[in-house]
Structure formats: structure tokens, C-alpha cells
Amino acid sequence: MMNDFELSLKSLGVSFTSKSIDKLRFYIEKVLLFGTRFNLVSNNDRNFDAVLLHVLDSVAGLPIIKDKNPRQVLDVGSGAGFPGIVLALFDNFRKYILLERSNKKATFLRMISLELGLDNIEVLERDVDKEQNKYEFITIRAFRDIREYARILKLILKDGGLIVAYKGKLNKIKFEVSHIESLFNKIEIKSSTMNDGKERNFLLLYK
């Protein structure tokens, strides 16, 4: 499956080396090793290929980040490092700030960042509604309804800033967007097509 993953990276225009792929393997192995202790992934995802799919979902957002070219990115609710660790691994041109409220998961994020030698990562251990700083670019893997967190994220978004929410099926996104249109200056939906055939969409919220 790693060969398919490398083909997906190429289709996205994401540069990689044998060293970055080795680091990725190491990262996935650590997620599996500490998965139970730190509650990193669900029971159904505790195998290499399942975690690799999370990695693929994460890296799919990198072309948007490179296109917008922010100085730094705040990743809200990083969990096991999807997408924050993965993005930082394949993009050392900017700083990634990983916001995670769980002590166990924040501890894992700090540990794996050091072991991978990712000096472009900072981990903040707190809830998003306790965050006081404002950011130009925010990512979130948004399994829940966007209405649950759109207002909170807008409060920590700089004027002219952008929130990129990793989402799934298009019809569900359109329903959610209809309830938050008045909150943002502009809303876009971008899709990502890769060779695994999975539907991946991104919700772009401009302040």
C-alpha cells in the first residue's frame, strides 16, 4: 500500500524523499504502538493500512496550504497528529502549531515530534475556547457538524484569515454551509481526487 501512497503524493504534487517515507513509517508504527495507551485511534483503525488512510486524508490538504502560503498553521484538535504531524513532515517551509486539549495526546504529539526531528512543530495543550491568540490559517479535521465550532474558530482567526476544514461527502457539507454562510466573508468547497477513489472535500471559510 505504500507504493499507492507514494503515487498519491505525486498526484498531489507533494515532494518526498526516501527519508521522509521512512519517517512516515516510523510515525505510523508509533501510532499503532501507543494507540491504546494514549487513545490515539479507534479499535477498527489499529492496523498499518488503516492508519495510512488517515495519513492520506491528512496530506490531501497540503496543496491548499502551499497555494495560500501562510507563515504558520494552527491545527485544532490534532489528536494522533492527523493532519498536523503529517503536514509538518511533508512541509518544512512553515511552522505548525498543534492545539490538543487531551494531556495524553499532547504528550504523544510532543514525543513523536522530537523523535521525528520536526523542529517546525509547537504543541499547545488546551481547549480551543481557551486560546487567546489569533491565527492567519487554521486547519481542523471536522467529523462533526461545522456549526458546532465555526463561531469558536472565527474568534481566533485573524481578519483576512482562512479556516480549512477537512470534510467528507459533498451533500452533507452543503447542508452545513447553509447554516453558517452569514458568519464568513466567503465560503468555498474544494475537492481532492486521488487514486484510491475516496471522496475528500475541504471547506474553506474566509474571514
Swiss-Prot record:
It is found in: Cytoplasm. Its main location: cytoplasm. S-adenosyl-L-methionine binds at residues 77, 82, 100-102, 141. Pfam families: GidB. GO terms for cellular component: cytosol. It is an enzyme of class 2 (transferase). It comes from the Bacteria. One of its GO terms (molecular function) is rRNA (guanine-N7-)-methyltransferase activity. InterPro entries: rRNA_ssu_MeTfrase_G (IPR003682), SAM-dependent_MTases_sf (IPR029063). Keywords: Cytoplasm, Methyltransferase, rRNA processing, S-adenosyl-L-methionine, Transferase. Its EC number is 2.1.1.-. Specifically methylates the N7 position of a guanine in 16S rRNA. HAMAP family: 16SrRNA_methyltr_G. Belongs to the methyltransferase superfamily. RNA methyltransferase RsmG family. This is Ribosomal RNA small subunit methyltransferase G. It comes from Borrelia turicatae (strain 91E135).
